[in-house]
């Protein structure tokens, strides 16, 4: 398996509260996930070391269509793509000319976005906790019930009825934070966004 430079994300994604009377993190998360089927946003991703200092910043565009389809287009500092069509997740490093493919269920540790794609029973697989409000966002914490999750926890930050931020803590103690801007939901997305074929001449690795 090649060493990829992905800072994933993550992540994670969906949106919108149905009622302010729903006060548990489980009900808020469910309302958030059920209220929209598509999403498009710009994102900035910052990877932090164990002391909380920024190590690398990246950014690009994110697209999601539930269930199971998402796409991260990284444009800086390196060109990378992460594409799920609902069956496989493709990781493409443009500069290294390398592609790896994973089955959707195997990709959670690499693409936390899968958690909110509608493909997993969250309450069966994660402990869901209320983290209160900070930086103007209401935070929900997801902790894997299995040690094989590939990460310690994921935080989802909601600002009103919009996805505003995410934080991933991996098993090596590193934090990845993602901030969203120019977010739109309930829009029509081009089906081609979620299609991927490895370009000619690239190295392709596939997890069995």
From Swiss-Prot:
Summary of the function given for this chain in its UniProt record: Participates in the translocation of lipoproteins from the inner membrane to the outer membrane. Only forms a complex with a lipoprotein if the residue after the N-terminal Cys is not an aspartate (The Asp acts as a targeting signal to indicate that the lipoprotein should stay in the inner membrane).
GO BP term, example: lipoprotein localization to outer membrane
A single GO cellular-component term on record: periplasmic space
A Pfam family reported for this protein in Swiss-Prot or TrEMBL: LolA
Listed name of the protein: Outer-membrane lipoprotein carrier protein
Principal cellular location given in the protein's record: periplasm
Subcellular location: Periplasm
Keywords: Chaperone, Periplasm, Protein transport, Signal, Transport
Subunit structure: Monomer.
The keyword tRNA processing is assigned to this record: no
Superkingdom of origin: Bacteria
Signal peptide residue numbers: 1-21
CDD domains reported for this sequence: LolA
The keyword Protein transport belongs to this UniProt entry's keyword annotation: yes
Gene: lolA
């Amino acid at each position: 398996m090649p060493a990829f430079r992905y800072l994933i994300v993550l992540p994670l994604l969906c949106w919108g509260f149905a009622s302010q009377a729903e006060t548990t993190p489980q009900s808020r998360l469910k309302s958030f996930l059920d209220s929209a089927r598509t999403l498009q946003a710009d994102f900035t991703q910052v990877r932090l070391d164990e002391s909380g200092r920024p190590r690398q910043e990246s950014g690009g565009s994110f697209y999601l269509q539930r269930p199971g389809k998402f796409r991260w287009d990284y444009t800086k500092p390196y060109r990378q793509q992460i594409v799920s069509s609902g069956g496989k997740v493709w990781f493409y490093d443009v500069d290294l000319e390398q592609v790896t493919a994973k089955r959707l269920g195997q990709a959670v540790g690499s693409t936390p976005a899968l958690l909110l794609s509608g493909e997993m029973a969250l309450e069966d697989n994660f402990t869901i906790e209320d983290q209160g409000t900070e930086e103007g966002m209401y935070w929900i914490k997801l902790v894997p019930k299995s040690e094989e999750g590939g990460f310690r926890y994921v935080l989802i930050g909601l600002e009103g009825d919009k996805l505003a931020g995410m934080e991933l803590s991996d098993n090596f103690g590193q934090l990845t934070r993602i901030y969203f801007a120019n977010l739109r939901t309930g829009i029509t997305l081009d089906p081609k966004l979620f299609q991927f074929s490895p370009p000619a001449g690239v190295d392709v690795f596939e997890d069995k």
